[in-house]
Structures are given as structure tokens and as C-alpha cells.
Amino acid sequence: YSNDEGILSIMYHRFNENKYPSTNIKMEIFREHIDIIRKSNFDFHNPNNFDEQFNKPKQKKEILITIDDAFESFYTEAWPYLKENKIPFILFVSTEPVGKRGYMTWEQIKEVEGNEFANIGHHSHTHEYLIDVSNEEFILDIETANKIFLRELGYIPNLFSYPFGEYSKFMKDYI
């Protein structure tokens, strides 16, 4: 397709949760997004091949689907559709809210993670605005999440999404 080595990425959060319009998408519109992606001849980038394929020239246009925060609405609304269609994605999980009202449980996360087209990513422990915390607080947050990921999944995810998309050089170097 081109010598461009990049991959387009689309991030989603909530599905069919009209109470949160800034982070919500209706499933009807989400399905339309997927249809447009397919009709535009994009391949869905499988996150399981992320490290080995990311910086290589692409034969076709590729797009990466990411889901932030592991809201329960992802599991009840989008997950059945993604699973049925085997659409690759990364689910970025903040460990602190897991199991709380409105969030997925570890059992649900493990179910999702058990599919070859799904990948669990690291999204910190508290989902704080990390740019406002000290380096020590940042390290504690990440290490707390790492321990929980090890306990619950048996590994620490190798893909990281910064909450709110902001970070410092220290944070980037630490991750």
C-alpha cells in the first residue's frame, strides 16, 4: 500500500451509555465505524503482533482498535460483536476500579483475554491524571497495578495507554 509504517488507531470507551456523551458511542454507530473501516480496505491490526509488525512497511492500510477503562458496557455491548466478528483490539485496564459498579470483573477480563484477537493493555492502577502526581506516586501507582496484573492474569501487559493521554519524560522512560 505504501512505505508508511504507521497504523491508524481509534479509541473507544463506553458503549450505549448515553449518560456519558463525551466518552460514549451507540452500538449502531460503532457497527457503522467497523463497516466503513472494512469498506475502506483497512486491515484490523492484531495487537498480538504489535511489537513485530508495528514499524514494518504495510501492504495494506491498517487500523488498531483500542478500548480504554474496561467499562462494563464494553463487555455487555461491544464484546459480543467484536467476538462474533473476531475483530482485533486492545482493552486497556486500570486495575483499581475492576469489579466495581460500572466496570468489568477480572473473570470477564480473563474471558476476553482468552481470545487470540484480544489483548489486555496496562492503563495504570488509579487512572489518575498522572501528569499531576509526583514521580514517586507514579511509580507506586504503576507497581501496584503490576502486582495486581501478575496476581490476576499471570503477567504484566506490555502495552500501555496513559490515562488522558498525557505523560512526562520520566513516565515515558519508566514505562
Role assignments for model-derived ranges:
Residues 26, 81-84:
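Glycine-rich, phosphate-binding/catalytic loops in enzymes
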Residues 171-175:
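Short, intrinsically disordered, charge-balanced linker/junction segments flanking boundaries
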